[in-house]
Amino acid sequence: AIIRAVPEIIIAIIILTVTGLTPFTGALALAIGGIGTHAKWTYEAIETAPTGPAEAVKASGGTLAEMVRWGTWPIVQPELASLALYRFEINVRTSAVLGLIGVGGIGDMLTGYTQYRQWDVVGVLLIVVIVITMSIDAISGAIRRRIVAAKFA
């Protein structure tokens, strides 16, 4: 629970003391923050899934693995896929911010061009970040809608 409460930028600053200013620092911060959040979402999806299909598999002599495979997984898979796409969106947005503290990526480029007051390049980079983020948001939103629609079809 604690790891989910700590923003990725704070995680990156803590990791920075060990790994230095490298892209690995940013990737590790995103991974640590994402794993905690995604584990919670996975737990909640499985916990709130209807138990009827899994109980039916068990009643017909299925093993625990078969209960999960045929009873629980088909129910939670669309939600987990949707949540993974959402987390990917969050990671893309956060990676630009992490780059501002010097751990690589487009945020690192923004910092460099800002220091040299090359505002035209900064403007283009900001537009690129916004367009990429909006595109990922639109694409993953469409995929999530399809997944959810298929779940209820």
What are these regions (language model features)?
Residues 104-114:
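Short, membrane-exposed interhelical loops at transmembrane-helix boundaries
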Residues 21-72, 78-87, 138-141:
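Membrane-cytosol interface at the C-terminal ends of specific transmembrane alpha-helices
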